[in-house]
Curated annotation (Swiss-Prot):
Binding annotation for Mg(2+): E282, N284
Reaction(s) catalysed by this chain's protein: 5-phospho-beta-D-ribosylamine + glycine + ATP = N(1)-(5-phospho-beta-D-ribosyl)glycinamide + ADP + phosphate + H(+)
NCBIfam families registered for this protein in UniProt: purD
Keyword Repeat listed: no
Positions of transmembrane segments: none
Gene: purD
SUPFAM superfamilies: Glutathione synthetase ATP-binding domain-like, PreATP-grasp domain, Rudiment single hybrid motif
Keyword field: ATP-binding, Ligase, Magnesium, Manganese, Metal-binding, Nucleotide-binding, Purine biosynthesis
Pathway(s) this gene product operates in, as recorded in its UniProt entry: Purine metabolism; IMP biosynthesis via de novo pathway; N(1)-(5-phospho-D-ribosyl)glycinamide from 5-phospho-alpha-D-ribose 1-diphosphate: step 2/2
One MF annotation (Gene Ontology) recorded for this entry: metal ion binding
Listed EC numbers: 6.3.4.13
EC top class, as a word: ligase
Protein name: Phosphoribosylamine--glycine ligase
Amino acid sequence: MRILVIGSGGREHAILKGLAADPATTDLHVAPGSPAFASLATVHADYKEVADPARMLELAQDIKPELVVIGPEIPLVAGVADTLRAEGIAVFGPNADAAQIEGSKAFAKEVMEAAGVATARAQTLPPGMTDDDIEHELDYFGPMYVVKDDGLAAGKGVVVTADRAEARQHIHLVHAAGNPVLLESFLDGPEVSLFCLVDGETVVPLLPAQDHKRAYDNDEGPNTGGMGAYTPLPWLSAEGVDRIVREVCEPVAKQMVERGTPYSGLLYAGLAWGQEGPSVIEFNCRFGDPETQPLLSLLKTPLAGVLNAVATGTLDELPALEWEDAYAVTVVLAAANYPESPRKGDAITSPDLADTDKILHAGTAVKDAEVISNGGRVLNVIGKGETLSAARAAAYEVLENIELADSFYRTDIGQAAEEGRISIDS
């Protein structure tokens, strides 16, 4: 099978690694990719305009792929999948209308309300609101204050704070950009990321994972795109996963069909598990980053066949997914000054830099035959083991041998679960 992957981050490196290991994959391409991906696929670095449907179609018509896998959310919201499907190309990823479940938080709230899915109460604050009206809404919702940019913000458009001034500042910042704000009630409880393959009303869950959004240890610092993740969750039972599928993912998939925007692709439910069970924090319309990296490292079922089943509408015929009986942890190595203004161009050295079992490249480039940093989240380090403790130890051992000036990483990815400090009633 000839396959084209769209994207250039650590998530796409993980997807390429999985596809390359599948005997059904005969020819693998990526755009725009990264020099680090060249050992797995043909890299089309000139095709950087991933959100331009015409440009992506041009590449697809040249390559003639049997399957296109779209990694990031921006091309999905921009309608790249629609354009490719219109030309008869099988695509893993939702059409633009369905991708609004991530592209507009207000739209996602409408879907959840219609589907009867538990979520935080919310109010949309449009640009142009008076200061008095904003203060009235802050009185009603906080503290804690949960302030979200209604559009795409790469996981960094959310402020959760007890500081009213900080909440007010973020509202004004989002409004100044011309975007609405979604003000929400705070959802307490441990967070769960559950990815589901969705083909119309057919829903197949992957292993549950937990992301770590804050930049620094102990969940301190600003929100980021994600500083690490682990899977599976020792504190969430199979019955708990079934409950999320039954109460959240299946009703949303059914509601999308009823709205005339059937979902095809990966539906990512970000949830908080409170006293009454799971409530939705957000939906994403694609594989999450960095949760995808540990998840796919445990998947035994060949990946190309899985993604193709979704893309061709045959997910209901796919045999049950098989997983390694193990734990996996991903820790993100971030550049200096991430997430505000990450520094680029610093040399990276490690004896494991080309070992995709240990390191995936999220934001690197090559200059004068030297690997350098080229993004905020630079490397994703993978550790696997029979226990969560062993997986954590494996990841941090690799990190100790990486040199990147002024870089940093969290030392507590998965630690609360390892120490038994997370528990729920499922």
